[in-house]
Every structure is written in structure tokens, then in C-alpha cells.
């Protein structure tokens, strides 16, 4: 078995990924609507795709169902995945599996290119795929791979960009330089932080190697020109987003940093103790895998001089970049695990660096039986990782603590259409503290409790064109804010979702 694995690592890699997908119930999850952790942000993503489909708008005119501002028009990350998903709806119908599937394809692409990168530093073997399996089975990385958010696609495209720039470094091929630049541009457009770390760290290493006369001025100049182009693309999109949101008076998407110095000491300690080392820790990986990462970090430090010169320096810049990011976005770590996804990049490269050292410096010196034993240990760790991922995915998708709104909202749209409520009719939806969870579920534009604060007024929404009030919690039927508008009941679903005519 181990001999076959060493001879066919890429087959084994995607076999393990397929096993991970099946064991973690990916066959069902891929068709789930937004749910569980960060249903709010997931629904925003779905809302972008659905409105592209329904409005037929262009790539540069994104909007959501929430009518804050002008007709719901608002932008954030480059919406190419939502745009592609919205257009695929025209051919295959509106299915959540299309959007989740696009993200998962990006995840697979990233796995493939990371495998290709590692192949440039060590011969193809079981050791080569081990770091990738640990990344692929990280529960929170996998959770967002089979999801709607753009973080994992951004990281995946940056792995592709890195591979092509590494090939350029070895061959001076302009074709590979251009392809890598395109991948890095797309990665940073999706997420400037998650998609940009790998590119910036590589540029830093290349610059140092140039100072040591390991590269020509022409190569450095070409890389700098491409980096300026990537930076220009990011700046151009950021400038457009600010202009677009200002034009449409919609600033629901935050575009700034969340630095640690905005927090008081008590809150900082809470994030460290209760979130990073508490609530979130189980979703990073199984404890034994985290201990293994700690061991790799220790070896990375004490065996520094023996490590691959490029990998040790590149990994160092990844660590420094991630630490800088953590300081600048630390406030978000309290409630958002996806803000921490960037940290998987230095983590996996620490493992890659140490594994390459083992492969080139340690294994050739030990008996074959010990190598065999190491292979068994690696397969065992992979099995533990797959099992932990399955458990976390099951918990996230089944536990009531992750249910934020009435789950029946995703079954209501056919009822609305039977009642004569058109997809274009404006509604008021409550309760819903998010901009788009219920609106995206009902597939109707309108207003929620989000971004209204003291201006929340059903009568005002009715004057703006809202025709119906949909309440998905019986307790809200008795709230003074809604009682005057619950006179014309025109339909209900499962005795917990009520539809009222506001006209």
C-alpha cells in the first residue's frame, strides 16, 4: 500500500479529498442554502448571485435584495464568482449547489497547484501530499471551501499564482509570469488579504535573492512591473467600490481594518482565551494535528540552517505577514473565524518546509523500516484529520446553537408565488437582524431590521413600495411595532410564518 502511495501520490491525494467530501456529507451539504456559522455573510453572497440572475445586470453593477440605499446596489469583493453563478442559473436553474460547487472547484484547483508547488521542492511521494491533506481537512478551511464566501477561492488562486511565478523563476518564461500575474490579480480582487499574502511574501524573497545577485535586473524589473499591475488592479477596484457605494448611498459593507488597538485589554484577553484558544480552536484542527504543527514550528526554528534556503525565508515572510494581518484585523476574530483563514497559509508552509527537510536530509539516513513506520504514522494522522473534519461539519450543520432564524424560510417561496406575490414585489421581513438572510430565502427585495436602527418604520417602507409583511416568529405578531400591520393576513406556512398585505 505504501509503495503504491509513493508511486501514485496525486491519485492518493484526490482519493483522500473525495473520501473527505463523502465522509463529511458533502453530497448533501453542497445543496444546502445558507446556514450555520455566518449565515448572514453567506446570504449576502447568495443575494449577489441571485440578483445578477434576476436583473440581468453587468458584472460591475452588483446588488443585493436589501433595498438600503439605491435599489440594493452595493459592492465589496470582486463579484466574479457570483456573476458566473448567476449566469449558470440561466442554464441549470437556481440551485445553491452551483455556488457551493464553484467554490469547491476553486478549493480543488488550489489543492492541485499547491501539490505542483511542493513537487518543485521534493520528489513526488507520500510526504509530498501530507501537508496538503492537513490543509484540505482543516475543518474551518473545508467549511468555507464548500460554502459561498470568497476566502478559500482567493487562497486557492494565490497558490496557482505562486506556482507559475516559481516556474518563471526557473525558466524566465514570460508566459508563466503573465499567467501567475493573472491568478494573483484575481486572488487579490477576491480578498486583498487572503489572496495577497503569498504574492507579497514571494516578492520580498525575490528581492532579497536579487540583492544577493541570484537574479538579473531584467527579472526583478519584470516582477516589479507585474506587482505594480496587481497593486493597480486592487487599488482600481477599491476606488470603484467606494465610488459605487457612495453613488448608491449604501455602506453596509465594511472596507477598513479592525486593529487590536481599538480593543480594551479585557476584550483582547477574551478573544485570546475564549475564542482563539477556546471556541474556535476545535475548528482549526484536531489537537494532535495542532501539536504536530507546533513540533514543526519548533524544528523550523532550531534547524533553520539545514532547511531549504528558499522555503525557510519564504515561510518567514508568510509568518511575519500573517502576524501583521492578525494585529490589523484582530477585533474581527471574536465573531468571525473566516477572518482567520489567512493563517492557514504560513501554517501549511511551516509543515512543507519541515517535511522537505525530512525528505532530503533525514529519510536518506534512516533504515527502511523506520521510513515505513513514518508512512504509517502519516496515514494515521490523515485519518484522524478526516474524522475530525467530519465531526466538525456535522456539528456545524446540525446543532441548534447555529440556527439564527426560522429554518422554514427556505420552503416559503412557492407559497408566496401561489399567493400572487411576484418575485419583484417589495416586502418587509421580520425578525431578521441581517440584510439578506430572509430576503434571499424568499427571493424578494425588501427591508429587514438591519441598517435601519431608529429609522425602522413599516409605514415608511410601505410608502417606499413595500406591499407585504412577512413574519417568521409568532412572538413578533404581538409586538407593538407590527400589530397595526397584521390585519390583512393573506397566507401562512406551518403556523410559524405569516404573510400580511400592507396595502
Feature annotation, model-predicted:
Residues 119-125, 161-177, 187:
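Membrane-interface transmembrane helices that cradle and orient dolichyl/undecaprenyl
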Residues 199, 406, 410, 414-454, ...:
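Short periplasmic/luminal acceptor-recognition loop of GT-C membrane glycosyltransferases, typified by
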Residues 143-154:
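Short acidic/glycine- and proline-prone juxtamembrane loop motifs at membrane-interface regions
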Residues 44-51, 55, 198-310, 323-333, ...:
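Transmembrane-lumen/periplasm boundary regions of multi-pass, lipid-linked membrane glycan transferases
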Residues 35-36, 337, 368-419, 433-441:
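Membrane-proximal, lumen/periplasm-facing interface regions of secretory-pathway glyco-
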Amino acid at each position: 500500500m505504501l509503495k503504491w502511495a509513493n508511486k501514485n501520490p496525486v491519485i492518493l491525494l484526490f482519493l483522500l479529498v473525495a473520501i473527505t467530501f463523502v465522509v463529511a456529507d458533502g453530497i448533501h451539504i453542497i445543496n444546502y442554502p445558507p446556514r450555520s456559522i455566518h449565515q448572514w455573510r453567506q446570504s449576502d453572497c447568495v443575494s449577489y448571485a441571485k440578483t445578477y440572475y434576476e436583473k440581468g445586470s453587468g458584472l460591475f453593477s452588483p446588488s443585493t435584495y436589501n433595498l438600503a440605499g439605491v435599489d440594493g446596489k452595493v459592492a465589496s469583493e470582486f463579484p466574479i464568482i457570483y456573476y458566473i453563478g448567476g449566469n449558470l442559473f440561466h442554464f441549470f436553474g437556481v440551485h445553491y449547489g452551483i455556488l457551493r460547487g464553484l467554490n469547491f472547484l476553486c478549493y480543488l484547483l488550489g489543492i492541485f497547484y499547491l501539490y505542483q508547488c511542493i513537487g518543485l521542492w521534493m520528489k513526488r511521494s507520500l510526504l509530498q501530499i501530507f501537508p496538503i491533506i492537513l490543509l484540505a481537512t482543516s475543518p474551518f478551511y473545508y467549511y468555507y471551501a464548500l460554502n459561498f464566501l470568497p476566502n478559500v477561492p482567493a487562497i486557492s488562486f494565490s497558490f496557482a499564482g505562486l506556482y507559475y511565478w516559481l516556474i518563471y523563476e526557473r525558466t524566465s518564461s514570460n508566459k508563466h509570469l503573465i499567467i501567475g500575474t493573472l491568478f494573483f490579480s484575481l486572488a487579490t480582487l477576491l480578498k486583498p488579504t487572503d489572496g495577497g499574502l503569498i504574492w507579497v511574501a514571494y516578492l520580498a524573497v525575490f528581492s532579497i535573492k536579487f540583492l544577493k545577485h541570484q537574479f538579473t535586473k531584467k527579472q526583478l524589473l519584470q516582477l516589479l512591473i507585474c506587482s505594480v499591475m496587481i497593486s493597480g488592479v486592487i487599488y482600481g477596484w477599491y476606488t470603484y467600490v467606494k465610488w459605487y457605494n457612495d453613488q448608491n448611498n449604501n455602506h453596509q459593507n465594511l472596507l477598513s481594518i479592525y486593529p487590536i488597538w481599538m480593543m480594551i485589554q479585557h476584550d483582547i484577553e477574551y478573544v485570546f482565551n475564549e475564542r482563539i484558544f477556546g471556541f474556535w480552536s476545535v475548528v482549526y484542527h484536531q489537537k494532535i494535528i495542532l501539536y504536530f504543527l507546533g513540533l514543526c514550528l519548533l524544528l523550523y526554528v532550531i534547524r533553520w540552517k539545514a532547511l531549504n534556503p528558499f522555503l525557510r525565508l519564504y515561510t518567514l515572510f508568510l509568518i511575519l505577514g500573517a502576524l501583521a494581518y492578525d494585529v490589523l484585523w484582530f477585533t474581527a476574530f471574536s465573531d468571525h473565524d473566516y477572518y482567520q483563514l489567512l493563517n492557514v497559509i504560513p501554517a501549511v508552509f511551516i509543515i512543507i518546509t519541515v517535511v522537505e527537510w525530512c525528505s532530503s536530509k533525514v529519510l536518506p539516513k534512516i533504515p527502511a523500516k523506520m521510513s515505513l513506520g513514518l508512512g504509517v504514522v502519516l496515514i494515521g494522522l490523515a485519518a484522524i484529520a478526516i474524522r475530525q473534519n467530519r465531526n466538525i461539519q456535522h456539528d456545524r450543520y446540525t446543532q441548534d446553537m447555529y440556527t439564527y432564524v426560522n429554518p422554514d424560510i427556505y420552503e416559503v417561496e412557492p407559497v408566496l408565488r401561489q399567493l400572487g406575490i411576484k418575485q419583484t414585489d417589495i416586502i418587509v421581513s421580520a425578525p431578521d437582524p441581517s440584510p439578506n438572510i430572509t430576503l434571499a430565502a424568499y427571493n424578494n427585495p425588501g427591508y429587514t431590521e438591519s441598517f435601519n436602527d431608529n429609522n425602522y418604520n413599516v409605514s415608511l417602507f410601505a410608502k417606499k413600495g413595500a406591499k407585504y409583511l412577512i413574519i417568521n416568529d409568532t412572538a413578533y405578531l404581538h409586538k407593538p411595532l407590527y400589530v397595526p400591520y397584521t390585519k390583512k393576513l393573506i397566507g401562512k406556512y406551518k403556523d410559524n410564518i405569516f404573510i400580511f398585505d400592507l396595502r
